[in-house]
């Protein structure tokens, strides 16, 4: 949770080379996967764990944990650990993240997200994507194609965190209180996205 918060803060601190505000304004959910790694122990070579929070009628939801694996994007990062961010930009993207498991590019359409001021003017993603994907590797933040990557619910870690089994949809729709340990992360997400709406 703390690692995901750090990734978000560092990426958003790069004012001219970050997620464009028009995308932040439309976001329905955000998934952050710190240090996605490449290794032979997973089919497809890539594996990572992260957290998801979704926008509700009264703010941002308590988080749940996810796993990401597979895909053919490893060549894009040179085999290095990389931080990933997935932004759901409409209700279809949100519905994908509510599923037990889905494949990017198959069950949900995705595109490499635009970055910075040039990305602010781009609207191509509105026509084609439910999810926008970003990576940060060795300090470089950019859109990345994650087609073929599977995203699944990490029920075990979520249960450990909450102390009881949780229904992911129930949590992400705002029906579960944010645990004290997750408040800084959720507050950070709300802060950055509120800034976007305020045009700051």
Where are these regions (language model features)?
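Small-residue-enriched, tightly packed secondary-structure blocks
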Residues: 1-200
């Amino acid at each position: 949770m703390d690692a995901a918060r750090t990734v978000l803060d560092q990426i958003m601190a790069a004012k001219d080379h970050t997620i464009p505000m028009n995308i932040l304004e439309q976001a329905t959910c955000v998934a952050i996967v710190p240090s996605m790694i490449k290794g032979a122990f997973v089919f497809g070579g890539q594996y990572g764990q992260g957290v998801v929070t979704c926008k509700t009628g009264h703010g941002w939801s308590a988080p749940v944990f996810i796993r990401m694996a597979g895909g053919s994007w490893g060549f894009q990062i040179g085999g290095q650990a990389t931080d990933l961010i997935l932004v759901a930009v409409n209700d279809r993207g949100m519905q994908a993240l509510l599923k037990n498991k889905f494949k990017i590019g198959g069950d949900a359409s995705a595109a490499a997200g635009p970055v910075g001021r040039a990305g602010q003017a781009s609207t191509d993603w509105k026509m084609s994507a439910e999810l926008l994907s970003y990576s940060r590797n060795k300090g470089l933040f950019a859109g990345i194609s994650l087609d073929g990557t599977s995203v699944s619910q990490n029920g075990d870690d979520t249960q450990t965190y909450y102390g009881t089994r949780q229904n992911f949809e129930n949590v992400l729709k705002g029906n579960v209180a944010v645990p004290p340990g997750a408040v800084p992360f959720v507050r950070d997400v709300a802060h950055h996205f509120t800034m976007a709406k305020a045009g700051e």
